[in-house]
Structures are given as C-alpha cells and as structure tokens.
Amino acid sequence: MTKRKLSKGQQRRVQENHKKRLQSKEKKNHVELDDTQLGEATEGLVISRFGQHADIEAADGSITRCNIRRTISSLVTGDRVVWRPALQTQENVRVNGIVEAVHERTSVLTRPDYYDGIKPIAANIDQIIIVSAILPELSLNIIDRYLVACETLNIEPLIVLNKVDMLDAESRAMVSEWMQIYKDIGYRVLEVSSYTKEGLEALTQALIGRISIFAGQSGVGKSSLLNTLLPPMEESILVNQVSDNSGLGQHTTTASRLYHFPLGGDVIDSPGVREFGLWHLTPEQVTKGFIEFRPFLGGCKFRDCKHNDDPGCLITEAVDKGEIAPTRFENYHRILESMSQVKVRKNINLDS
C-alpha cells in the first residue's frame, strides 16, 4: 500500500510533536544544581551541545557536561562561556555543572530553516574550509554557492580540492586551471589528497591558530581529511566505506563537536554545514557575494539592471572583456534561477 504523502503543515506538526517529546524527556533527566552545590565561576568553551545540556571544556582541558541556564536563549558549539562546576561529582549523574552566561560572539555561522528561520550552528568561526573533490563530481557551481554563503556571513573561506591523486596529468592541469579562476580573484585554494598526503602540510599551516569548520557535500572526503589532521582519539570522526561503484561516502556526523589540532587551532565538525541554503537571500545579496562583481555595481545604465542582457550593464561588459570569468557569471545566474524556483518564502531577519 502506497503511503500517503504528508502536507507541509502536517510535516511541521509532526516535527513540533517530536520536539515536544524530546523536551519532555530532557526535563525528566534534568538535574538542578543550587548555588550551594556549585563552585566559583570560571571560563569555558562549548565543545558540543545536546538539547538542554552542553559539554564544557575548562582551562585544564577537562570536559564537564553542564545544564544550561534557562535565561540563555542561544548556545552553540564554539561559544565561550562562564560556567560553574559542581563542588562534588554526583554518582550516576552525568551533569556536574551549569552554564551561567555566554560571551559576545566574534562571528556566528547560521543556516536557513524553513520553519525556524535563521538557526545558529557554530560560533566564533574564523574560516570555512570549502571541501570539494573530483568525485563524486567537481561542481564549480556548488563551490560558488558556498562562497556566496561565506561572503554573506563575512567569514573567510579556504577552498580545498581533495582526492587530486585520482587525476591523471591532463585532468590535473585542467582542474588546476579551473582553480586558478578563484586564485585570480583573491581566494586561497589548496589541492590535497588525504590518501597520498599531498598538500596536507599547507592545509595544516592554514588551520593553526584559527577556529575552522569544514563544509562540503557528502562523499568529498571531509571526515577522511579530519581524521588525517587530528590526533588519534577514542571517539574518532567516523567514515563509512566508500562504494566502489559510486565513489561516494556517507556523512556520519550527528552532533556538532569541537576538536583541537595538534599544532594549534580548532575545528568544528557539524552536520549542519553539508550545504548552505541560499533561498533566504535577496538577489542583491547574491550579487554582492560574487566579489569580482563589486567594482562594477552601481555603474550600470539602469538601476534595476539584471546583469543579463540589459543594455549598459558593466558586469556583462566585464565578462566580454575577460575581466570576469564566464563560468562564474553563468553560475551567478544559475543560483538566482534556483532561488526563484523555491516556492516557499518566509520573512527572515538576517540579523537575528
């Protein structure tokens, strides 16, 4: 018997009921600690967040699972906080502290959600590592979508092309030519292989002293790269076997978590950055997200120029003169077209 397809309203009610059940269970497991049971306030770092609890790393590197004060409206991996440890560790109780306050963020990585608006998924990020690969398929369009997201969030990107060991000399030269497009407009690009270790030293140096997050589609080798770069851990970032037929891996991260690199710097591994939706952006924001367009903006003949076949368009003139790469220009219009096809729209405050 064919299952009846749920409407969007029904799907939303199912999702809300699911959240209520989870919250109800969390309340039953919630252990309250009063002030007499708590030590002095101290600084900490959110390593991971689980519902009403968070794992907090102290200055000595120890990790304590804590309750979160109900007055804290938003807490994500990467947040720097003030917390208080329990004076005595309680037997059979996993929660041994409480988060009291959150420091102001230097940046916040967000993603759009159809029902909940803009959702924060990580804080204090310095750079986004855009991981792409020749398998399952090298898509410059997807790279450009990530770059627009980075520019909109004002977080520096680093493009990492993985699995270059699978290219022959001719294909490698062609791919390097494509990557030169991004280098020419000021983006950093690294060609690496987690298998042969090519380019990993340069990537390691780029990660030192920064908080990074790896973004990319499933199968491009994000988890393999992280397992190569990180020290051996009891709980490693799992990587499923890649199919011999498809060349695809499977994304196995289930909760955002922060890890430390041996030479310095941190990484947040999160399931929320498999892809960045752009449907909540305006066409103007997408246009500004193509950094090589910016010198020409405001100079077109018509104020409502669509930068396509409009007469007097400085951007199309720049493409004709070779000042803007045709592939980037084509991907710009592909992104706008994909946004126009999204029928569901919600008014979202991007500053929230």
Curated annotation (Swiss-Prot):
Molecular function per GO: GTP binding; GTPase activity; metal ion binding; rRNA binding
Compositional bias per record (Basic and acidic residues), positions renumbered to this chain: 13-33
Annotated CDD domains: YjeQ_EngC (cd01854)
Protein's job: One of several proteins that assist in the late maturation steps of the functional core of the 30S ribosomal subunit. Helps release RbfA from mature subunits. May play a role in the assembly of ribosomal proteins into the subunit. Circularly permuted GTPase that catalyzes slow GTP hydrolysis, GTPase activity is stimulated by the 30S ribosomal subunit.
Name under which the protein is recorded: Small ribosomal subunit biogenesis GTPase RsgA
Oligomeric and partner information: Monomer. Associates with 30S ribosomal subunit, binds 16S rRNA.
Family indicated by similarity: Belongs to the TRAFAC class YlqF/YawG GTPase family. RsgA subfamily.
Gene Ontology biological-process entries: ribosomal small subunit biogenesis
Location of the region described as Disordered in the Swiss-Prot/TrEMBL record: 1-35
Basic residues bias: start-end ranges: 1-11
EC number: 3.6.1.-
Primary location class: cytoplasm
